[in-house]
Amino acid sequence: MQIFVKTLTGKTITLEVEPSDSIENVKAKIQDKEGIPPDQQRLIFAGKQLEDGRTLSDYNIQKESTLHLVLRLRGGY
């Protein structure tokens, strides 16, 4: 199924995923497309931050859902 990931810059990334895919797996796909390390990615859906060990179906994420990607940058505060 396809889902969309919207970044803070307004860019939308399209990913091909399965409902059984873990959040980690989705972050790895984002890394493949965008080069962003998974440890810097925070994915938000329906106002909730998604945890690595859970799956898309755990969060009731269905085809053509849009996730929001927030980057957690290291240091600098």
UniProtKB/Swiss-Prot annotation:
Bilayer-crossing regions: none
Keywords: Cytoplasm, Isopeptide bond, Nucleus, Ubl conjugation
Cell compartments where the protein resides: Cytoplasm; Nucleus
Major location (coarse): cytoplasm
Chain positions of cross-link Glycyl lysine isopeptide (Lys-Gly) (interchain with G-Cter in ubiquitin): K6, K11, K27, K29, K33, K48, K63
Cleavable signal peptide: none
Protein name from the UniProt record: Ubiquitin
Organism: Encephalitozoon cuniculi (strain GB-M1) (Microsporidian parasite)
